[in-house]
Regions:
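PAPS-dependent sulfotransferases, especially Golgi type II membrane carbohydrate sulfotransferases
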Residues: 1-5, 172, 201-309
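PAPS-dependent sulfotransferase catalytic core
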Residues: 1-91, 220, 285
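Structured catalytic/translocation cores of nucleotide/phosphate-coupled proteins
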Residues: 6-16, 21-30, 34, 109, ...
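A structural signal for well-ordered alpha-helical scaffolds and beta->alpha junctions
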Residues: 20, 49, 53, 60, ...
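Proline- and acidic/polar-enriched loop/turn elements at helix boundaries
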Residues: 39-40, 138, 210-213
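Positions that flank functional sites
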Residues: 42, 141, 190, 214-215
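A polyampholytic, Gly/Pro-enriched intrinsically disordered region
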Residues: 58-63, 154-163, 230-237
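PAPS-dependent sulfotransferase catalytic domain
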Residues: 90-209
C-alpha cells in the first residue's frame, strides 16, 4: 500500500513495569493520537490506564501464543519465527489495523511491551504501509521493575532481571539505525517538562501547553510510583552484563552516548550474544548459571552479615 504522505508512527518500547504507560500518555502532549480503543484500566496496577490499543495488544498476544511463548518467557524469538508469523494471516490483520489508524491520523502512538520482542514482524508491516516509525525506549531501574513484578506477579527478582535483559536488548537490537530515543522513567517523573522538551526537540514536535500542564500536574502522580531502585547497582544487578547495559542506557537517556556509534553497536552486539546464545537451551542454561551465581553471592553475603552481629 502506497501513501502520498509519509505517516509518522510513534512506538513505545521497553520492559513491562518500566513506565511505558506514562511515556505513552505523554505523547498526547505533542498532539499524537492514541486512539480510543484501549485495554481496560486495572486499579492497583495501572490506575491511570495502560494506553494500549486493544486490537494490537490482542494480536501480539495471539502471535506469541502461536509461537508457544508467553510474555514472561525468556525464550528467544528467532528470525524463522518472524518469517512464520509474516506468512500467516497475522500479517494481513496487522496491516489492516495500522492502515485504519494511520488513515485517520497523521501522527499515531502505540504501546505494548511485547512490541519490543515482536518488532521485526511489525517493521515488515511498517514498510508495506510506507509508515515512518519513531521509537521511544522506556528505561527504568531494573530493581524497580523487579520490585513491581514481585508485587504484581510474585516473580523472583532473578526472573524479573532476566526478563528486563531480554526485553531491553530486543528493543535495542531491533531499533538500530532507526529514529529512536531513550527516555528515563525516573527523570520523567522528576522533571517531566524537561524530558518532554527533550523529546520534542529530538523530533521537532511542538508542545501543546494545555496538554503539558494536564500531564505534568494532573496525570503524573508520585504516589503511584511505588517502587524505586535505590540499592547500589552492583548489589542486585549481577546477572550477566545487566549493570553495564543499564549504565550505558542511562547515559543515552541524557544524550551522552550515541547508541548507533560503531563502537557502541559492537559492545551491544557482544552483550546480546551473551544473553541470547544461538540455541534456546543454551540461552536458558546461561540465564540459570547467572541466576545461580546471584543466589550463591547473596547466601554468602547473608552469612557474613549474620556473623558480624
Amino acid at each position: 500500500m502506497q501513501q502520498t504522505d509519509v505517516k509518522r508512527l510513534f512506538i513505545v518500547l521497553g520492559m513491562h513495569r518500566s513506565g511505558t504507560s506514562a511515556l505513552t500518555r505523554a505523547l498526547k502532549v505533542f498532539d499524537i493520537d492514541l486512539g480510543n480503543n484501549h485495554i481496560p484500566t486495572e486499579p492497583g496496577v495501572n490506575a491511570k490506564g495502560f494506553w494500549e490499543d486493544r486490537d494490537i495488544y490482542t494480536l501480539n498476544v495471539e502471535m506469541l501464543r502461536a509461537l508457544a511463548i508467553r510474555w514472561d518467557h525468556t525464550t528467544p524469538i528467532r528470525p524463522s519465527d518472524i518469517q512464520y508469523l509474516c506468512l500467516k494471516p497475522f500479517f494481513q490483520r496487522a496491516q489492516a489495523l495500522l492502515a485504519a489508524r494511520m488513515g485517520r491520523y497523521e501522527r499515531f502512538g502505540i504501546k505494548d511491551p511485547r512490541l519490543s520482542r515482536l518488532l521485526p514482524f511489525w517493521q515488515h508491516v511498517f514498510v508495506s504501509l510506507d509508515i515512518q516509525p519513531h521509537y521511544l525506549i522506556a528505561l527504568r531501574h531494573p530493581a524497580s521493575v523487579a520490585q513491581s513484578l514481585a508485587v504484581r506477579n510474585h516473580f523472583r527478582k532473578e526472573k524479573s532481571l532476566a526478563l528486563w535483559l531480554e526485553y531491553t536488548m530486543a528493543a535495542l537490537q531491533h531499533s538500530r539505525d532507526t529514529s529512536r530515543l531513550v527516555v528515563d522513567y525516573d527523570r520523567m517523573m522528576h522533571n517531566p517538562v524537561s524530558e518532554l522538551r527533550r523529546i520534542g526537540q529530538h523530533w521537532n514536535l511542538c508542545l501543546n501547553d494545555t496538554e503539558l500542564h494536564h500531564y505534568s500536574k494532573d496525570f503524573l502522580d508520585q504516589s503511584l510510583r511505588h517502587h524505586q531502585g535505590s540499592d547500589p547497582l552492583r548489589t542486585f544487578m549481577e546477572i550477566g552484563p545487566l549493570y553495564k547495559i543499564f549504565s550505558v542506557l542511562q547515559k543515552a537517556a541524557v544524550d551522552q552516548v550515541d547508541l548507533d556509534r560503531a563502537d557502541c553497536c559492537a559492545q551491544i552486539d557482544q552483550w546480546y550474544r551473551q544473553i541470547r546464545p544461538s540455541h534456546t537451551s543454551r540461552a536458558r542454561h546461561t540465564l540459570k548459571r547467572w541466576i545461580r551465581a546471584v543466589a550463591i553471592n547473596r547466601s554468602v553475603a547473608g552469612k557474613l552479615a549474620a556473623m558480624q552481629h
